[in-house]
Curated annotation (Swiss-Prot):
Protein name: Kinetochore protein mis18
Binding site for Zn(2+): C25, C28, C79, C82
Gene: mis18
Alphabetically ordered keywords of this record: Cell cycle, Cell division, Centromere, Chromosome, Cytoplasm, Kinetochore, Metal-binding, Mitosis, Nucleus, Zinc
Any single GO BP term: CENP-A containing chromatin assembly
Amino acid sequence: MSQTETSHSGYIDFKKESQPSVFQCKKCFQIVGDSNAWVISHREYLSFTLSDAVENSVRVEDTFKRSDDGLCVYSELSCTRCNEVIGKVYNSTPIYLDDIRDMYTFSMDKLQAYQLGNKTVNPEGLTRYQVDLEMREDIIKLKSFCLSLYEKFELHDETLRSVKETISSLKKPKIEGKEGKKEKARTYSKRTRK
């Protein structure tokens, strides 16, 4: 089965998974149920129970059998495609197994789980989740790089504006007032008299 969370009591809680799963017969791959009908898992019995199964995929046998310890009465569940026995429907159980009575209890070793939307693999063999993480890291790196480029651009732009202002102030002729012109004229006339 795919990754699931196990509580302290030994049960697997499939409802905590983010993506739904379908359960298939290992022998012929016929779909017999999905995690939307998940009830409980018993690790000690290597089984899990669903409240419902896919119609026409599972056959409940008409004969009743008794468990080895004599505490349970059940009917076997068979795959309709390959006739493989894949689980049981408990008709009579002790109190501690009341939660699985009259439901579909499947043997973990007879079924396989396929998690929908989670096992997409690209050519490099990475899952979609791994690709998303790598893309996120790349985006963060690019964002950081772009921000540093922007800061450098701002610094260079500010320096360039300052240089342009300095150059334009040097190129402009100084506008002199009347007194400056008179002083130049006096200096010029003194030179010419000598």
